[in-house]
Design a protein with these regions (language model features):
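C-terminal motif of bacterial Sec signal peptides marking the signal peptidase cleavage site
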Residues: 16-17
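Alpha-helix boundary/capping residues
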Residues: 9, 73, 77, 146-149
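A well-ordered secondary-structure block
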Residues: 92-181
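Short, conserved catalytic or interaction motifs in soluble domains
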Residues: 20
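Short, well-ordered surface patches within globular domains
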Residues: 26-103, 156
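Protruding loop/beta-arch "assembly-hinge" segments enriched in small, turn-prone residues
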Residues: 23-28, 176-180
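N-terminal secretory signal peptides and thylakoid transit peptides that target proteins
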Residues: 1-13
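Generic N-terminal leader/processing signal
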Residues: 2, 45, 176-177
Length: 181
């Protein structure tokens, strides 16, 4: 659901993990106006999917517990000041934090799909894939990307982050649901 890594990238990530100590994930931040608007636009599309029997919940509830993980990803682009970026060893060290978030979240939630960041190329190049927009056509594609992971239909929560790079706002999101529900 979060950024998936190729075998070579995973190996670099494992090497990066060996050097750093673990710290507990920070508390999620309150949503910005853009993030709240984005969730409203996503829910408009999500409702149509619910009406068509394609998802289990009529609306997604904004829950920023997973934002820390997607904020790590977005932060790599913000720090690099470029929407297309070749991952460095330093970036890989930062990505270790995603594993910490995932372990923490998986105690409580099952994780669904995500959208907004490409898979790494063979050269470790990644890109922000969705410029911020609340237009139906753009949001439809964004939701379709989230739905590419089949279990996303069970989602009841969404975390979003809108990184700003070179004066443009982008959007990243992931969905999840309670394990015990």
């Amino acid at each position: 659901a979060f950024l998936k890594l190729s075998g070579a990238a995973a190996a670099l990530l494992a090497l990066a993990a060996c050097g750093g100590g673990s710290s507990a994930p920070a508390a999620p931040s309150a949503p910005t106006g853009k993030e709240a608007e984005l969730v409203a636009a996503i829910n408009k599309i999500w409702k149509k999917k619910f009406d068509a029997g394609l998802v289990d919940h009529e609306q997604l509830t904004l829950n920023q517990e997973a934002q820390g993980a997607i904020k790590i990803q977005g932060g790599i682009f913000e720090d690099a000041k470029e929407p297309v970026h070749t991952l460095t060893t330093e970036d890989m060290k930062k990505l270790v934090g995603i594993q910490e978030w995932q372990i923490s979240l998986e105690k409580k939630y099952d994780l669904g799909g995500a959208a907004g960041i490409s898979e790494p190329s063979a050269e470790f190049e990644v890109s922000l894939t969705f410029e911020y927009s609340c237009e139906d056509a753009v949001v439809q594609k964004f939701v379709d990307k989230i739905m590419a992971y089949s279990l996303s239909r069970e989602a009841e929560f969404i975390s979003v982050y809108c990184p700003v790079v070179q004066g443009k706002t982008y959007m990243i999101a992931t969905v999840f649901w309670n394990k015990t529900a």
